[in-house]
């Protein structure tokens, strides 16, 4: 800031000999510390004292106007605490003002004599605004102080139109008035609304920070009262050394009749002296220059809201109430047991019923992070060994039965209502029961847990939901031909190993007959996993896991139960041959192949083989070709959503297999006799080699359909296409008749039945073509009908050779996979149920149940031939992948058929009536993407 000076006060200026009131403006970075003014060096001491008092009263009210940035300077003869006098020097460059403004400025600056005409407007600005208000002064003091006849400081009040109305009163005794009476006497007036004329806004001095001192010795002294407000004015000017825009505040002038009349009572939050409160500066911000005492000490009488303004900026904003979070956190850490997922109330609060709240509903900030992770902690859905299973773990021992849950997963035995809890939280299903714990005071002892685990199915499932890799004993499975065969129960953390066929039959004999050949293992009479939830969720990604159930023993000529090399869970990676670490993503693999498969599937890499897609993938060369390695992972049945299992233990596996196996007869020479022995093991059981539903599918299979093609005539494009259309019409009628006999199809709405047939008739026809070509000619030709068989030569001569090559891929896949008739029948039904409208079906629930039932039948059909967990899972992957690939293949047939139908007259091709109706009504919709294909695997 530019230092402004005034003339020496000792030089006589007028005829009366009165000293000139030329004040000296001090530098902006200086402030006085509230010390007593030293005696002026003028010859007229009483007049100087009176002038200083009046100037203090005028300066205390000057900042009260929000638009007034003029900070008056004190007199030029004032001395600082260090004893250095400030001699004022005139400023010749300041413009002169008119006499009336000069008189007003002189009156406001406590000029002891009449104003001179040659002084600038800044000469009448005392610097008393930089000192704290006196005991009797308030913030409501007027900016333009009138002069009483008894006070020779000023002869008349200001005439500035922006000034407030002034009252006649003496300003001399203001310094001696007691506290609390400021503004009741001669020193009261309204707030000034703007700066005086003649002073440009750019030349107005800026206020100082509340805690910044201009004097060297003032930093160590504590101010008795806060000085001027250290806030930013409306114009945007901030004090030097202040925290900046964080401490924004605008002192408001007193309004209303009281301010106009001169009475300005202190605000409720103001100090006793009338000074407005200064916001407390946050200690986390850079401290301004000044004493720490002034920075930290709030103004006397200030409300906490005003003094701790900055503290609210750093308070963390939580999504829930602090009381609720505190009670919730304490309850989660201290709860010992929980009942149905409800939470215990905080200490000292009455319990009340409420909707159970899951731990996942609360943000991470509500739970304290564990400083030291516990070795015995495990996830609520993790794998552990209940004591009732009687399977000793070689690696963990008894520790697996005594593990305690993580603190944030525990819950209390009661429910409660928190005051700060959101009222609209949805009621969530209860959490599964926790595992038995060995900690002092936690849960029941191991014996009680073991008794609960081995209890009957009438009791709660309890710890039976949490099981290790295999379970030795279980309840009989549900009866019926459509019983599910899950790999694991929802909530279970491991893959369940079922009994073999004979063992399943024997265990089910106590409860009743079961028509299924290989029944899955039951757990505490818990309902088996329905495929409606597991298969139809997210594009059916988890359907292959149930194949791990079909691990059956192979009998040979030995006295003890022996299992083939394929049936045992081996500790060899099925991808590269390295040592396997566990069952990852549904397949027994090593850690390297597990990580590779996860990264390859999540990253959606498009690997390309540099060879012929037959690279060797072993422990040494597994990194050479990622394309062949990924292909081998998919062929083995690895699924990205598969659950991970614990490390295999050979002793545990052998004991489990011995427990579930039944003694086999001695001296059986071949496999056929062993199979017959297993079937006739229990005469009371109605055990069949083929499930009844598959037998029913065989019985309703349509008869051979002829195309009526005349093979005596040479093939032409029109005659060949016309014969194929006639064959398609007959096959379409056959599909309608077959679907009416299909179990469960008539339960659907009639519109849904028509829609499914119209969407899938082409898929069913080409799938039947592939099956006939595979069975009758071993996939060497296209066997459309007994009277219409196209070899490769006839395909080349036809006009749709490329289309024939596309259809030829299906019998070649059948030959490669060696598809059985049972598998073909189940896959054919799934093709009928493989495409639905985008908006869904009218009877969507019945459709899902029907589809789930036939997926289970496909599982049973796979289990009739496959003898191991891995082979069954791999087989299911291959068959379902073939069903998914048919969508793209059939789309090419739809496009060719629609183009031929449109150009039928030009091509001289006849289309039957029913087939024409289906093509015209549905093919444009299918090709436009207005249907939803149901895929087993995500692309």
Curated annotation (Swiss-Prot):
The modification Phosphoserine is found at residues 20, 141, 200, 303, 349, 404, 682. Phosphorylated on multiple serine sites. Several of these sites are hormone-dependent. Phosphorylation on Ser-303 occurs preferentially on isoform B, is highly hormone-dependent and modulates ubiquitination and sumoylation on Lys-392. Phosphorylation on Ser-303 and Ser-349 also requires induction by hormone. Basal phosphorylation on Ser-200 and Ser-404 is increased in response to progesterone and can be phosphorylated in vitro by the CDK2-A1 complex. Increased levels of phosphorylation on Ser-404 also in the presence of EGF, heregulin, IGF, PMA and FBS. Sumoylation is hormone-dependent and represses transcriptional activity. Sumoylation on all three sites is enhanced by PIAS3. Desumoylated by SENP1. Sumoylation on Lys-392, the main site of sumoylation, is repressed by ubiquitination on the same site, and modulated by phosphorylation at Ser-303. Residues 693-939 are annotated as: AF2. A zinc finger (NR C4-type) spans 573-593, 609-633. One of its GO terms (molecular function) is sequence-specific DNA binding. Keywords: Cytoplasm, DNA-binding, Isopeptide bond, Lipid-binding, Lipoprotein, Metal-binding, Nucleus, Palmitate, Phosphoprotein, Receptor, Steroid-binding, Transcription, Transcription regulation, Ubl conjugation, Zinc, Zinc-finger. Residues 175-314 are annotated as: Mediates transcriptional transrepression (in isoform A). CDD domains: NR_DBD_GR_PR, NR_LBD_PR. Residues 463-552 are annotated as: AF1. Residues 15-26, 49-67, 211-230, 257-278 have a biased composition (Low complexity). Residues 1-572 are annotated as: Modulating, Ala/Pro-rich. It comes from the Eukaryota. Residues 1-302 are annotated as: Disordered. A motif (Nuclear localization signal) lies at residues 193-197. GO terms for cellular component: cytoplasm; nucleus. There is a cross-link at residues 7, 392, 537 (Glycyl lysine isopeptide (Lys-Gly) (interchain with G-Cter in SUMO)). Belongs to the nuclear hormone receptor family. NR3 subfamily. This is Progesterone receptor. It comes from Canis lupus familiaris.
